[in-house]
Design a protein with these regions (language model features):
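Long hydrophobic alpha-helical segments typical of transmembrane helices together
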Residues: 219-262
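Gly/Thr-rich phosphate-binding beta-strand-loop-beta motif of the actin/hexokinase/Hsp70
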Residues: 2-30, 122, 128-150, 166
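Short beta-strand-loop/turn "lid" adjacent to the catalytic site in phosphate-handling enzymes
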Residues: 55-111, 147-152, 158-159, 187-198, ...
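Glycine-rich phosphate-binding loop signature in dinucleotide/nucleotide-binding domains
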Residues: 57-60, 125-127, 216-219
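N-terminal glycine/serine-rich phosphate-binding loop of ATP-dependent small-molecule kinases
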Residues: 1-98
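Generic secondary-structure signature for well-ordered alpha-helical cores
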Residues: 55, 87-88, 168-175, 198, ...
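Adenine-nucleotide phosphate-binding core of ATP-dependent small-molecule kinases
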Residues: 33, 39, 181-223, 241-242
Length: 262
């Protein structure tokens, strides 16, 4: 049975659609889990979902827990879970966390924890001006400078949310599996939908990247990072994306915790 090291950290990212969790040892993620978000689950039910990720005989060896959430109700459930099952100290990452980021926004308290983690993760991992695109329930596009200036964010309906809304409202359009489109203009309903849904989202992202670069010509190099559950689907269609980094959010939470702790 796997033994945890003396420095083992559980990181939890609570989103609107999914909850992702990672176990970190010696600055490396060694295990990962993802499951659907639901306010109807109890702390005990969520703990049962964590069991495959954890060595339940060594819970006390997890000496720190890091959490970020954009769902307050789920945050309360998970804090109860930590109190009930763990003895580790819990660190919440939010806009008040002392990370050295300068937020050029009207009210930093409204910035989602995931956006903060993405920005900080990009800052620490890539040491460059960065565009971070996160494909989740919403698609977020944010820009942070190498010096740590959080310049702002664009929020659009996520690809799957947009597709679900279309299928729900259009009587003659049946739901389809979202896969890479094979044509630009479809000659049947399925291909037409795939092109409009997937290509349309990708072209929006490409345009945003180019517009951000146009507005920041003073930057020597801008690294564009794509993350989120469907990043692999969209990545081939967005030429200006440099990196697919599916762990940047969890990594960002972990790196934020390390920065605050030390």
């Amino acid at each position: 049975m796997e033994k945890y090291s003396e420095t083992t950290t559980l990181v939890v990212d609570i989103g609107n659609t999914n909850i992702t969790c990672g176990i970190y040892q010696q600055d490396e993620m060694i295990r990962f889990a993802r499951f659907y978000s639901s306010a109807h689950r109890t702390a005990d039910e969520y703990f049962s979902l964590l069991i495959p990720l954890l060595n339940t005989e060594s819970l006390n060896n997890i000496n720190s827990i890091v959490i970020g959430s954009v769902v307050p109700e789920l945050m309360r459930i998970w804090m109860h879970l930590f109190q009930k099952y763990f003895s580790a100290e819990v660190w919440e990452i939010n806009a008040l966390s002392p990370l050295g980021i300068s937020y050029k926004v009207d009210d930093p308290s409204f910035i989602g924890a995931d956006l903060i983690a993405n920005a900080f993760g990009a800052l620490k991992k890539y040491d460059s001006d960065c565009i971070i695109i996160d494909l989740g329930t919403a698609t977020t596009i944010q820009f942070i400078t190498k010096e740590g200036s959080f310049e702002g964010t664009a929020i659009a309906p996520g690809l799957k949310v947009s597709a679900d809304a279309l299928f729900e409202r259009a009587a003659l359009l049946s739901q389809i599996e979202i896969v890479p489109p094979s044509v630009l203009l479809g000659t049947n309903t399925r291909d037409a939908l795939l092109s409009g849904i997937v290509n349309g989202h990708a072209y929006m992202l490409e345009c945003y990247i180019q517009q951000i670069k146009t507005h920041h010509t003073d930057c020597q190099k801008i690294v564009t990072i794509l993350t989120g559950g469907i990043a692999d689907l969209v990545y081939p269609l967005v030429p200006s994306v440099d990196i697919v980094d599916k762990t940047i959010t969890l990594d960002g939470f972990y790196l934020a915790y390390k920065t605050i702790r030390h």
